[in-house]
UniProtKB/Swiss-Prot annotation:
Annotated protein name in UniProt: Leucyl/phenylalanyl-tRNA--protein transferase
Superkingdom of the source species: Bacteria
Reaction it catalyzes: N-terminal L-lysyl-[protein] + L-leucyl-tRNA(Leu) = N-terminal L-leucyl-L-lysyl-[protein] + tRNA(Leu) + H(+); N-terminal L-arginyl-[protein] + L-leucyl-tRNA(Leu) = N-terminal L-leucyl-L-arginyl-[protein] + tRNA(Leu) + H(+); L-phenylalanyl-tRNA(Phe) + an N-terminal L-alpha-aminoacyl-[protein] = an N-terminal L-phenylalanyl-L-alpha-aminoacyl-[protein] + tRNA(Phe)
Organism expressing this protein natively: Neisseria gonorrhoeae (strain ATCC 700825 / FA 1090)
First-level EC class: transferase
Length: 241
């Protein structure tokens, strides 16, 4: 199989439909992980999955797992935790720390992490540009001091939020962050959350599958529409629970 080589001076991607037709989803490889290439990738439903020997591998997945914010489902046990817990949720309070924890988190059936230092640097750049955001769940420790317990990060372009990775140092901490983040993002105008892959974890929150062509069309429409207001850095209240 011939793997498409992405030109260093051109951020355009081949049509992901060809990669999906081959069943492997590999859209191309590049030597760079520039912010401009990352943004162009997300706009086209493509994301970087891992690196090897200095090459970055870009993939598309279809059908695509997404969450429509108004159809978010919060499992009953998690809703109880949300009502009774002493947690605090914030956005963009400690982005670099969240990414570092996601990189260090153990994953089933994975040897190591795909979030290598080059990826962390790239997402930090997107964060500085206002496109990458973290949601953090904090819990008080035994001394009553609030500490980071879990969270996740992703990329926002227009009215789409592209989820990337989660971690939890305490049970349900990343789930709490996600359950609070979705209504918050919806209030700001986000209309679609990209989960990338179809997992049981996201199905519990009400994820659904879109044919890739439909997903790509939604991206074309929603990426061009700005949010009602910037995500910023603030506390996040859990609503409707």
């Amino acid at each position: 199989m011939r793997i498409p080589l992405l030109a260093p001076d051109n951020y355009a991607f081949p049509d992901p439909a060809y990669a999906l037709a081959r069943c492997d989803g590999l859209v191309g490889v590049s030597r760079d992980l520039d912010a401009g290439r990352l943004l162009e990738a997300y706009r086209n439903g493509v994301f970087p999955w891992f690196s090897r020997d200095g090459w970055f591998f870009w993939y598309a997945v279809g059908p695509r797992a997404v969450i429509v914010p108004e159809r978010l489902h919060v499992p009953r046990s998690l809703a109880k935790t949300l009502r009774n817990g002493s947690y605090r949720v914030a956005v963009n309070g400690c982005f670099a720390e969240v990414v570092a924890h996601c990189a260090a988190a153990a994953r089933p059936n994975q040897d190591g992490t795909w979030i290598a230092p080059e990826f962390q640097t790239a997402y930090l750049k997107l964060h500085e540009m206002g496109h990458a955001h973290s949601f953090e769940c904090h819990y008080p420790d035994e001394n009553g001091k609030t500490r980071l317990a879990g969270g996740f990060y992703g990329v926002q372009i227009g009215r789409v939020f592209y989820g990337e990775s989660m971690f939890a140092l305490q049970p349900d901490a990343s789930k709490i962050a996600f359950a609070c983040a979705v209504p918050f993002l919806a209030d700001l105008g986000v209309e679609l959350i990209d989960c990338q892959q179809d997992t049981e974890h996201m199905r519990r929150f009400g994820s659904e599958l879109l044919p890739f062509a439909d997903f790509a069309e939604r991206l074309r429409m929603l990426n061009a529409v700005p949010l009602k207001e910037e995500i910023g850095r603030r506390e996040v209240a859990c609503k409707g629970l």
